């Protein structure tokens, strides 16, 4: 939903929420209205959006009809992918062989936005609304999304439903890789050794010339070239039919993702400062037990991610501008243990369980550069202090216990209880920089600002049942029914993030900043899945 900046319809906009008016009568009224959904306050007022568009004045500059100031857009990521792949395998001895191959890939992804629904309007004027607001309307050039169209017709495009608007560019990726793997086994020992070497080239090709960046938006960007490689080894040993161990190690370097390689790919060709190839080092080891139908596995792992890059775009209340926040040198460290077992109880009934414990933390204080989106000017740079904070949005402790049943007549059923803990909120990097500190902040104020929220532990009960019928040993008819969250617990937080924005608080002598309220994702209530299938 795209709306006029001064007529926001997003219901969780901070000025529509009770927390913005804490301690006032309107705050108390809003709190009650949100709890009871008075006047559908939780929902978008679609009738109002249509009425606003239908009541806009006509403007002959853009033809007949009324200009929409609210509409629904559809963001496209249209891929065109060419792949060439070849491989070979050669038997060296009875128990040894070598495999190898080569892969060539050319990917061109077109990113653009399309006018999907004008909500009662007749056309959409294709200009950068935020640049128009920030720079005023005296000089129309800076807020043109397509300068070639503007120079030809003397005004911005009047986009109709189905037309492209706002941005249109290609993301290009050219990759060549060659790999080889050696496998051998003897006396219960298995060894795999493998390697890969390659090269990746990334570049942006702008299809439109933006008014804000006349010389840096259309055509090819700088081409980013990366050497890529991968080295890995795997070892396994069977003591007996019941006992075995395996271990593996890997080190690799890969090109960054296209969207992380450019500061603002929708508007210009500028490369993210500090961008580099990403590295991964990992080791893991497991012990496996199998005695009859009893199965168990114990595993440990350690993984280090290095030199990752991330770009955020947001409105910065400190600098009063829309910004791109580019971080480089992000390191993460994951390590943990996993235990799983399956024990038969009686005639098709089994007890299953698993325990997973991990510690996933940031292992560096990344460098950041904050760039004003409308000008490309660097507003701030420094360090993000989040070393030893937890990686977000995944439970780092989890347990599962359940019963499963499978009969000889192809009937199967299961029920399981899942427990999750040590799950953390996604952090705002801005809160952990020196840019938001003021002279009158105490150490306690800083700790509170930079504290990372941990979610409450949660339990979820699930169940499923299904059956297959075989017809003439050729066809299969079957069904399955799965019910998730049987206890209908809708208070479980599954993720969320700190907003990057800050509220300014001023007194006679100082200015301080208050974080916006965090946003959360919650688990659905009881959910049912029914699947009927026929295989032939």
Identify the function of each model-found stretch.
Residues 302-304, 325-431, 533:
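Gram-negative outer-membrane beta-barrel transporters
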Residues 351, 419-438, 467-536:
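C-terminal beta-signal and adjacent terminal beta-strands/loops
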Residues 69-71, 97-240, 367:
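Signature of Gram-negative outer-membrane beta-barrel scaffolds
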Residues 392-472, 495-496:
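C-terminal beta-barrel architecture of Gram-negative outer-membrane proteins
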């Amino acid at each position: 939903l795209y709306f006029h900046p001064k007529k926001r319809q997003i219901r969780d906009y901070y000025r529509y929420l009770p927390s913005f008016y804490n301690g006032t009568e309107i705050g108390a009224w809003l709190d009650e209205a949100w709890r009871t959904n008075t006047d559908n306050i939780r929902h978008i007022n679609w009738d109002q959006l249509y009425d606003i568009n239908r009541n806009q004045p006509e403007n002959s500059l853009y033809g007949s009809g009324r200009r929409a100031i609210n509409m629904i857009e559809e963001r496209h990521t249209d891929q065109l992918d060419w792949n060439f792949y070849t491989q070979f395998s050669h038997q060296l001895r009875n128990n040894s062989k070598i495999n190898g191959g080569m892969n060539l890939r050319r990917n061109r992804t077109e990113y653009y936005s399309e006018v999907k629904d004008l909500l009662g309007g007749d056309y959409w004027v294709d200009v950068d609304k935020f640049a128009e607001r920030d720079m005023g309307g005296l000089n129309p050039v800076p807020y043109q999304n397509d300068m070639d169209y503007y120079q030809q017709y003397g005004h911005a495009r009047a986009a109709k439903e189905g037309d492209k608007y706002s941005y249109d560019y290609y993301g290009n990726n050219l990759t060549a890789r060659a790999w080889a793997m050696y496998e051998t086994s003897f006396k219960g020992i298995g060894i795999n050794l493998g390697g890969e070497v390659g090269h990746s080239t990334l570049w942006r090709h702008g299809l439109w010339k933006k008014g804000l960046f006349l010389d840096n938006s259309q055509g090819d960007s700088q081409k980013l070239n990366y050497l890529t490689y991968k080295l890995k080894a795997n070892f396994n040993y069977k003591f007996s039919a019941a006992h075995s161990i395996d271990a593996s190690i890997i080190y690799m370097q890969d090109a960054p993702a296209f969207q992380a390689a450019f500061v603002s790919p929708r508007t210009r060709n500028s490369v993210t400062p500090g961008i580099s190839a990403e590295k991964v080092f990992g080791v893991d080891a497991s012990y496996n037990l199998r005695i009859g139908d009893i199965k168990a596995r114990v595993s440990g792992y350690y993984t280090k991610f290095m030199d990752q890059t991330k770009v955020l775009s947001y409105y910065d209340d400190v600098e009063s501008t829309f910004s791109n926040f580019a971080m480089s040198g992000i390191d993460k460290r994951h390590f943990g243990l996993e235990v799983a077992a399956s024990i038969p109880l009686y005639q098709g009934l089994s007890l299953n369980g698993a325990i997973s414990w991990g510690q996933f933390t940031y292992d560096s204080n990344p460098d950041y550069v904050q760039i004003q989106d409308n000008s490309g000017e660097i507003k701030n740079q420094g360090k993000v202090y989040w070393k030893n904070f937890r990686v977000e949005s995944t439970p780092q402790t989890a347990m599962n216990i359940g019963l499963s049943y499978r009969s000889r007549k192809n009937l199967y059923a299961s029920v399981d209880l899942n427990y999750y803990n040590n799950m953390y909120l996604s952090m705002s990097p801005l809160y952990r920089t020196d840019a938001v500190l003021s002279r009158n902040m105490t150490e306690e104020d800083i700790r509170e600002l930079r504290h990372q929220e941990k979610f409450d532990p949660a339990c979820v009960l699930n169940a499923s049942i299904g059956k297959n019928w075989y017809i003439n040993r050729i066809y299969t008819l079957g069904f399955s029914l799965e019910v998730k969250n049987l206890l209908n617990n809708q208070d479980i937080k599954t993720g969320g993030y700190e907003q990057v924005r800050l509220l300014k608080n001023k007194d006679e002598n100082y200015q301080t900043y208050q974080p916006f309220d965090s946003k959360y994702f919650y688990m659905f209530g009881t959910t049912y899945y029914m699947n009927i299938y026929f295989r032939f």
